[in-house]
């Protein structure tokens, strides 16, 4: 039996809350980078961060946009006699300023972590009630990014107003330092963060922590994918669980403030290649931050070629900054081993008049899937230009780096990295305006009015397209 869900505006308060421009001038596109938590947790050190940054640079990923190196929890040894945070000298013998300087000298940006609670999630000193001195500590150490968690919050949650003011205290403190610091809330979507986050932050988590599973339910992530207002977010949430929770929230994100679906799990667990190929572009098209959660020293060629797919990254970094919308969703009978099975179509506008389209197969078998211009341009009126024009179809995975080339790059063949897009030399915005072919995939056909876009999508896989007005 099929169940059909069409997008509604039943929870939209955009007219009330809106999506304002960046509150601090940062986050004009979703942030990209690397965070140690998903792979290394508390096993952190100065050497890990600097070696990882060097490897990201060598692989050409820094120049593709992965510039934030984010140090997560477990870096502190407490506070000094003046109440300021102190870095663990065993893990960071040269101090945080040394780490920041090394990263800055190599064109990276430095991120650190704290929690809006008495303690961090791993039990280290938190910043609740200490916002001004801790913000000054981060500024003094030339930090460019703060991930701000939600553990040990002393019960200061339960309404949007309570959570808003708890997180605004750090926002104000960061601004007071005078240093531009990207502010990333990690409050798990508690108290409807997507309604109020854009006024005080550049991104906000909208669910419990991710795990490297495509559909597997977990009792530690108690809310299913339809519960966007989850009272207990938990953790070990699957990719599809988080994606479905995010579906109604795109209307409350945009330039300067982004829904954060959590770090990328490409090469973190045992996802299949098709699952990784679906995970990455779905995060990209809903304009989630693209934060690598893997050990970059153990990337497989197939995973590397996903992280380095410029035509997908260009969707995420599109200057229009509008998250894609889930247009339809069906449950299907061919469920997987966890009893999960559904198919979806997502669509969204891009800056240059193009449109991004995804056909997502969450079922257990490959299946034919299709869509039409009426579905793709779901907000257009009958007879509008979008519905009466012919569109060229570009497959955004068609020019994926092959395993041989990826292996050469991973083996530090500097010549091989020359094929990669370099966003340091030419921004994605400029590359799109100049029609750089690396950002558009490969043309595979056209879609005329009243025609149907047909394709076969693998199990737990995706068909991912950019539509361009036909010449």
Swiss-Prot record:
PROSITE patterns: ALPHA_GALACTOSIDASE. GO terms for cellular component: extracellular region. The keyword Methyltransferase does not apply. It is found in: Secreted. Keywords: Disulfide bond, Glycoprotein, Glycosidase, Hydrolase, Secreted, Signal. GO terms for molecular function: alpha-galactosidase activity. Disulfide bonds join 42-74, 121-151, 221-237, 223-230. It comes from the Eukaryota. Its main location: secreted. The keyword Phosphoprotein does not apply. GO terms for biological process: melibiose catabolic process. Homotetramer. This is Alpha-galactosidase 2. The active site is at residues 149, 209. It catalyses: Hydrolysis of terminal, non-reducing alpha-D-galactose residues in alpha-D-galactosides, including galactose oligosaccharides, galactomannans and galactolipids. It is an enzyme of class 3 (hydrolase). Substrate binds at residues 72-73, 147, 205, 251. Residues 1-18 form the signal peptide. Glycans are attached at residues 105, 175, 270, 370, 403, 413, 422, 435, 454. Belongs to the glycosyl hydrolase 27 family. Its EC number is 3.2.1.22.
